[in-house]
Design a protein with these regions (language model features):
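Short, surface-exposed loop and linker segments with low hydrophobicity and enrichment for Pro/Ser/Thr
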Residues: 6, 98-100, 105-108, 152-160
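Mid-length scaffold segments of soluble, non-membrane domains
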Residues: 73-123
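Bacterial N-terminal signal peptides that target proteins for export
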Residues: 1-10
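Structured alpha-helical
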Residues: 13
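N-terminal signal peptide c-region/cleavage motif recognized by signal peptidases
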Residues: 17-19
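Absolute protein N-terminus
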Residues: 1, 22-23
Length: 180
């Protein structure tokens, strides 16, 4: 029984190490509006995915009513617009994202969020034009066991399937995706 438990623990640690090795923070700096900024790289299925975003602090504010109001477009971070760069096509639900650089927005809600992928890049985070949308995909909402004081965008992998995570406050918005 002990040997079996050790094998299971070893497998879990190996999976965690593989996921951690595939994702790394490559840059941290202060943004133009005062929030720290982070650039995360993630490699999966032969694709290199990079997300650069501002990481505002919650500071006792409420996510869905004060900072990222439910049903309204949100810059998904702070300061400059959040960018996604991929060297391979990605599929979030039925939304196909070709290789390239895009701006990410979200539409938060209490039970589900929308991921909004815009073809417009290089703008300040609040400059949004719906006619520049590549498309939208559903994000599932989960409750975090411990609140995230800062916006955190990360990737996880389970059974070879990658997932995008956006954490803030007690909310985690997630979407599995595929590389094409």
């Amino acid at each position: 029984m002990f040997v079996r438990s050790m094998k299971i623990a070893g497998a879990v640690l190996a999976l965690a190490a593989t996921t951690a090795a595939a994702q790394k923070v490559v840059a941290t700096k202060m943004g133009g509006g005062g929030s720290p900024h982070e650039t995360v790289e993630y490699s999966v299925g032969g694709a290199k995915i990079t997300i650069s975003y501002g990481r505002p602090f919650l500071k006792a504010r409420k996510v869905l009513s004060e900072v990222a109001p439910a049903g309204k477009i949100w810059r998904t971070g702070a300061d400059e617009a959040t960018t996604l760069t991929t060297d391979k096509g990605l599929m979030f639900g039925s939304l196909m994202i070709p290789a390239g650089t895009y701006t990410l927005y979200t539409v938060p809600g209490p039970t589900s969020w929308k991921l909004v992928v815009s073809k417009q890049t290089g703008q300040w985070g609040t400059a949004y034009s719906e006619d520049k949308d590549l498309g939208r995909a559903d994000l599932k909402v989960e409750t975090l066991p411990k609140p995230a004081e800062q916006v955190t965008i990360s990737f996880t992998e389970a059974g070879g399937s990658p997932t995008l995570n956006i954490d803030w406050g007690t909310t985690r918005a997630t979407s599995p995706f595929m590389v094409h």
